[in-house]
From Swiss-Prot:
Protein's UniProt name: UBX domain-containing protein 10
GO terms under biological process: ERAD pathway; positive regulation of cellular response to hypoxia; proteasome-mediated ubiquitin-dependent protein catabolic process; SREBP signaling pathway
Protein encoded by which gene: ucp10
Protein location: Endoplasmic reticulum
Domain of life of the organism encoding this protein: Eukaryota
GO molecular function, one term: ubiquitin binding
GO cellular component annotations of the record: Dsc E3 ubiquitin ligase complex; endoplasmic reticulum
Coiled coil stretches, renumbered: 247-311
UniProt organism field: Schizosaccharomyces pombe (strain 972 / ATCC 24843)
Main location (coarse class): endoplasmic reticulum
Length: 427
């Protein structure tokens, strides 16, 4: 058939039933471009012409006249529809239908159903078309009931009111977690679905479920033609009794496997968390051990340098100045109650007094080290990278005041020209 003849067939079907162009093309392709068969498929009126032919000659004449009139009007329609810009002035010739997604189409159908009959209908899947519904039940190992209806069929209103709005059927489907989808075969996707499931009469109901034996979806039941809720429930009950036990066993086994897998996952997570805590504790213990070892090593280094410094100080203590130099004469009282009297240069700072006290304490605290430092003929050098900290404080007696190492002796009247110094050890 030529392209122009095909277009004429599409236009004729659309003018007769007002279906979208893509749906009209799909239907006509399925019926080898026979417009009459396509109309009968969508309306279910295959025997109407035969019945009408029995009404007598008068009706036959009327039919012939009507056919001629319709043919003439159709040709005029075809000519006008091809005139450029005609749709701009006469909107009826324009193609204004918007192509909807499967989800939008499903939602539109349910919305129309609610506008006509109310909201107490079967719970429908509206996230997509019938393919999305089948994908979902395959993923979830479930059951789906697909309704294929035709808005051009005389039984459409009765079916919608008595079946799609039936509360007993709704409860039956909900109790068994059956996913429901409905589509109008005057829309392209629903028509393709009806052809896939070989639905030749409308409305049709197709029960699809996952088969554990085949690992794929199978058709468990099909109902065509005049349907009522009780017959649907009866047929679904029989089909489910035959196929559902194996599916439920499969689901139970699958749930048991998933529960065992989840338990193993939780146990593994708990074990890994325990290992992580152990590693964290071990890492903390190692870090603490390393810190303590480092601090000990640093203290030992400082202590070693301190001994070296005190040994150097002991071997290099300056002699007492003579009386002619007008020195400061200080009486030094130690924590053990002992006293020492010594002269210091008036131009020296109080640090020289601190050095002398450290010298005396070194002798008291570490006599062996002190003896080696003062008796050795080998010169002792001060340690590098070391700042000596005195482990005591010096105070004047009257008035009691802290003596700072950096202050000149001659500027402090409490110790110059003479005075008493008290030694207090740090805690």
């Amino acid at each position: 058939m030529s392209g122009s003849r095909k277009q004429e067939a599409i236009d004729e079907l659309r003018n007769s039933l007002d279906v979208p162009a893509d749906t009209a093309q799909s239907v006509l392709e399925s019926f080898n471009w026979d417009v009459q068969e396509a109309i009968e498929s969508l309306t279910g009126e295959s025997s109407r012409v035969d019945r009408n032919s029995k009404l007598g000659l008068s009706f036959g004449v009327f039919q012939s006249v009507f056919s001629l009139l319709f043919s003439g009007l159709h040709k005029l329609w075809m000519i006008l529809s091809r005139v450029p810009l005609i749709s701009t002035f006469i909107p009826i010739f324009g193609t204004t239908k918007r192509v909807l997604s499967p989800a939008d189409t499903a939602n539109k159908l349910v919305q129309n159903l609610e506008e006509q009959y109310g909201t107490e209908h079967i719970d429908f899947f509206t996230d997509g078309g019938y393919m999305e519904a089948l994908t979902r039940i395959k993923r979830n190992y479930g059951v789906a009931l697909l309704f294929f209806t035709s808005s051009k069929n005389d039984d459409s209103e009765t079916f919608s009111r008595s079946v799609l709005m039936n509360q007993e059927l709704k409860e039956f489907l909900n109790r068994r977690n059956i996913l429901c989808w409905t589509g109008d075969v005057c829309e392209d996707e629903a028509f393709r679905g009806s052809r896939q499931f070989h639905c030749t009469k409308f409305p049709s109901a197709v029960l699809v479920m996952y088969s554990p034996q085949l690992s794929e979806l199978v058709v468990a039941a099909q109902l065509h033609g005049c349907l009522d809720s009780s017959s649907i429930i009866t047929n679904l009950t029989n089909a489910l009794a035959k196929h559902l036990p194996s599916l439920e066993r499969f689901r139970s086994e699958r749930e048991a496997r998933e529960a065992a897998r989840e338990l193993r996952r939780q146990q593994d997570n708990a074990y890994q968390a325990s290992l992580a805590r152990d590693r964290e504790r071990q890492a903390f213990a190692r870090a603490e051990e390393e810190r303590l070892a480092k601090e000990k090593e640093e203290r030992e280094i400082v202590q070693k340098k301190k001994k070296q410094y005190r040994a150097w100080l002991a071997s290099n203590l300056p002699p007492e100045p003579s009386s002619e130099d007008e020195p400061a004469r200080l009486s030094i009282r130690f924590p053990d109650g002992s006293r020492a009297v010594r002269r210091f240069k008036k131009d020296d700072t109080v640090e020289s007094v601190y050095n002398y006290v450290d010298y005396m304490l070194f002798e008291k605290e570490e006599p062996e080290e002190f003896g080696r430092a003062t008796s050795s003929s080998n010169p002792v050098t001060p340690p590098s990278d070391y700042k000596h900290d005195f482990h005591f404080q010096l105070y004047s007696s009257l008035p009691r005041a802290l003596l700072k190492p950096s202050v000149a002796i001659s500027t402090n009247k409490a110790i110059f020209p003479n005075g008493t110094v008290v030694v207090e050890l740090d805690d």
